[in-house]
Design a protein with these regions (language model features):
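Short beta-strand elements
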Residues: 119-133
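Short loop/turn segments at connectors of secondary-structure elements within structured domains
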Residues: 46-48, 107-109, 121
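Surface-exposed beta-loop interaction hotspot
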Residues: 1-39
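Short helix-loop boundary/capping segments
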Residues: 23-80
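A general secondary-structure signal for short beta-strands and their flanking turns/coil
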Residues: 31-33, 70-72, 89-91, 108, ...
Length: 133
């Protein structure tokens, strides 16, 4: 499920912004899920749980004037390593339901997702919605 920064307990500290790589992203044909293949560093201990979130970040005081004309919906893929040691590289998959942004999808080409990568800092990935047949 997509979470909104600042809503309820969804604070910057809880959601985190630790480094993570996205190696592949895709949206299901029915546009209901975004799946992300990812890499991260950790100890891979059962005692250390990492948290992953897909975030709507409304921290900007005023949206840019051209936001209404933007062809992509902006989201952030966030990682909280909960203080785990960056011991070895691991990988996995996670899927997020897109129902919270379903109304915003009309007329858009896809999603623009911000990721704080392991090696290259902040990157933005554009993932297009599948074409309807």
């Amino acid at each position: 499920e997509i979470v909104t920064m600042g809503e309820g307990e969804n604070t910057e500290e809880k959601i985190g912004d630790d480094k993570i790589n996205s190696t592949y992203m895709w949206i299901t044909q029915d546009k209901k899920y975004l799946t992300i293949e990812f890499q991260y560093y950790g100890t891979h201990s059962e005692d250390k749980k990492h948290f992953l979130n897909l975030v709507i970040n409304n921290k900007e005081a005023e949206p840019a004037a051209d936001d209404a004309n933007d062809e992509y919906i902006d989201l952030e893929f966030r990682h909280n390593d909960e203080g785990d040691t960056a011991d070895r590289l691991g990988e996995g998959y996670i899927s997020f339901k897109l129902d919270k942004i379903q109304d915003q999808m009309k007329g858009k080409k896809g999603l623009r997702i911000r990721v704080k990568t392991l090696y290259n800092g902040e990157k933005f990935y554009e993932v297009k919605f599948p074409s309807s047949n």
